[in-house]
Amino acid sequence: MTKRNFGKDYKTPRELVTLLENRGLIINDRQKAQLYLESIGYYRLSAYMHPLLKTPKILHLYKEGATFNKVMMLYRFDKKLRLLLFNEIEKIEIAVREAVMNMTAERTGDIYWLTNSALFRDQSIFVNSMVMLSKEYERSTEDFIEHFKRTYTEPFPPAWILGELLPMGSVNMYYRNLKDKGLKKQIAKRFCLHAPVFESWLSVLTLTRNACCHHARVWNKVNKIIPNDMRGMTRPWITIPADKRRIYYNMCIIKYFLDIISPNNDMLDKMHNLFSKFPEIDLAALGFPVGWENEPLWQ
């Protein structure tokens, strides 16, 4: 692909409102639209304008009946969806961290295993992990970390304390790099998964978690990572083919984990509540297949 100059000048929110109107977007309240462009930004909102464009989208002309109100509806729905997903992934992140930290300490007999290079396959990855972990430890102002630094002589706390500084992606990185395949299998089995699937699903959840943390669009995004399939599934799962790059499949993964760590979870109720508040949302854009509610996972 040949590169070219950016070639676009800055436009004020007022000028952007006029530009959108000239392209066919219906704006009933120019002042309110200008306020949203000032507080949210045109670039962020453009992701929610994109589905309303005519084909070919490169012409930047809007479909008949496309409104700025619809843009804001999509924006608000995505925001609510991110909050829902992040709150549910948090529970999984805590449970997975506990399993990896404690099960590894128990099996290896090393409560400081996070800093033991002998337990890891790839030493370059381990070194990078230690650099990251050391920085997190040194700059942490958490009470439990400050207490350990004041009280004990060891350079680092035990894994179940130090691990509290690690986000899901880092926990998965440590897990993937473990030498002991039997240990990895044992940890994955805690969640009724094979080790490669466990790794893959954690990677997908990490992407979704980070998207939620950074307020990125999730509702109709196509993920770059395609999660592995689990063969011989022993727990309720989905049977209707679904696009594994869409957020629906991610939500299935979230529900699967929740059903293990919190069997009485109310994720489905939260989803119904969200969808009822945004009846205009086309669930197919999120990857939901027809009949999804009848799947064993969602019963």
Regions found by a protein language model. Give the residues of each.
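Extended intrinsically disordered or low-complexity regions, especially N/C-terminal cytosolic tails and loops
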Residues: 1-207, 219-299
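Acidic/aromatic/glycine-rich contiguous surface patches that form carbohydrate-binding/processing clefts
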Residues: 215
